Every structure is written in structure tokens, then in C-alpha cells.
């Protein structure tokens, strides 16, 4: 992952940039599993920890790339105090 991508991901903590890029981050295994089940538009998964087999299978079924990142980088991208090490980049759905 290059520095430009890291900056873009960390910028998504601010609403202005979420609106500009039309993307947002979700964090945690459970919420990512729920997003996959509901058909959310997940662009990419980032993992610094072991993913559950069900998440890997669902990501592969939806052709979602999974990028392994080190824990330090996951903490930098995360907006939580104690990050789970699993993040997903999602597209904001278009309003009808």
C-alpha cells in the first residue's frame, strides 16, 4: 500500500472527504460479515489479523480483493481507540 492510498483512507474519517470520494470505512469482523451478507458495495478488505473463513469465502464470492496489512498500518487507518485489525472500504450507495 502506498502513501497516497494511506492518506486517502485516513481522510475518510472526515465527512467532507467521504462525500468527495463517495466512500467510507467500516471496521470489525462482525459488521464486515453483516455488510457482506447484506450485499453492501465493498471495494476492498484490509486485514492485519486472521479473517474468519466465512468472511474470506464471501469476499471471494463477491470478487472483493483482500489486502494484508501490518498492525501498525491498520491502527493508522483505523478511527477506533482499539482497532480490530479488519477494515473494509465501501462505496456510498447512490440516492434514488
Q: Language-model segments: which ranges?
A:
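Boundary-proximal intrinsically disordered activation/regulatory segments immediately upstream
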Residues: 1-55
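General structural signal for secondary-structure boundaries
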Residues: 2-3, 48, 70-73, 96
Amino acid at each position: 500500500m502506498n502513501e497516497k492510498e494511506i492518506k486517502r483512507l485516513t481522510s475518510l474519517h472526515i465527512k467532507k472527504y467521504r462525500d468527495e470520494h463517495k466512500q467510507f470505512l467500516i471496521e470489525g469482523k462482525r459488521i464486515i460479515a453483516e455488510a457482506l451478507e447484506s450485499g453492501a458495495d465493498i471495494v476492498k478488505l484490509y486485514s492485519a489479523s486472521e479473517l474468519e473463513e466465512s468472511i474470506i469465502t464471501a469476499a471471494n464470492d463477491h470478487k472483493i480483493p483482500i489486502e494484508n496489512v501490518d498492525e501498525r498500518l491498520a491502527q493508522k487507518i483505523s478511527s477506533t481507540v482499539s482497532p480490530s485489525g479488519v477494515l473494509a472500504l465501501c462505496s456510498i450507495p447512490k440516492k434514488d
